[in-house]
Amino acid sequence: MLVIYFIGSLLASLVSARNAADLIGTWTTKSRQVFTGPGFYDVVKDELIEPRLTGISFSFTEDGHFEEAFYRAVSNPQDPSCPKGILQWQHGTYTVDSDGSIHLNPIAEDGRQLLSDPCSSSKGIYTRYNQTEKYSSFTVDVDPYYDSIRLNLYSFDGSPMIPMYLAYRPPEMLPTGPLQSIVSKKAKRHFDSKKVTPFGLRTLISKDNLVDPNRWLWVGIVMSAMGGITLFFT
């Protein structure tokens, strides 16, 4: 009898972990510096706002809207001490299929991307961004280490993304409809040729990025180089 009860409870928890309602809220990676909403994208000025550290944030509403904010570092094989940075923001609608996969359908005109290469250019490149996305599955559970509700997303190929933790419920988001009517006319007029100040180099390396094993090699090279410089001057 106890075995049957245990199996039933386990199955119930697994079903709950795939419940689309569990997605509702704003999620962020462990740096807790990147959040969707007006703190990441200023619609009126049409500007992306650089967070203190890199990270990822997703928001989902009960009626099928999403918003995402990415601040990523991209390794530079020619100069590992000089990574590039990318800010990306988009929003739109989402669906959850019966197999647990998530489909994100962004509003094409609203997405924004800022690419910064501070070691080769004094200006960042600001463009529109529109990327339909699919996540093969997701789970929501309680992280025993952080004692927080954790969202585990899996990319289209099944590879896990960096875990995200519940930050707000209800979610912190910009208006879910098209934003082009809000963007100032001045911002629209200069958008196609817009160049902005690049990110600060110190923000492009954070704990979130160290989770990716492919970056450990470059981190090791940078640290070895820094150690050599320290030894030389001591």
Swiss-Prot record:
Cell location: Endoplasmic reticulum membrane
GO molecular function, one term: unfolded protein binding
Intervals, Cytoplasmic compartment: 234
Membrane topology type: Single-pass type I membrane protein
Highest taxon of the lineage: Eukaryota
Biological-process GO terms, alphabetical: 'de novo' protein folding
Glycosylation site positions: 130
Side of membrane Lumenal, spans: 18-215
UniProt protein name: Protein rot1
Primary role: Required for normal levels of the cell wall 1,6-beta-glucan. Involved in a protein folding machinery chaperoning proteins acting in various physiological processes including cell wall synthesis and lysis of autophagic bodies.
TM region(s), chain numbering: 216-233
InterPro entries reported for this sequence: Rot1
Record keywords: Endoplasmic reticulum, Glycoprotein, Membrane, Signal, Transmembrane, Transmembrane helix
GO CC annotation terms, alphabetical: endoplasmic reticulum membrane
Family to which the UniProt record says this protein belongs: Belongs to the ROT1 family.
Residues in the signal sequence: 1-17
Primary residence: endoplasmic reticulum
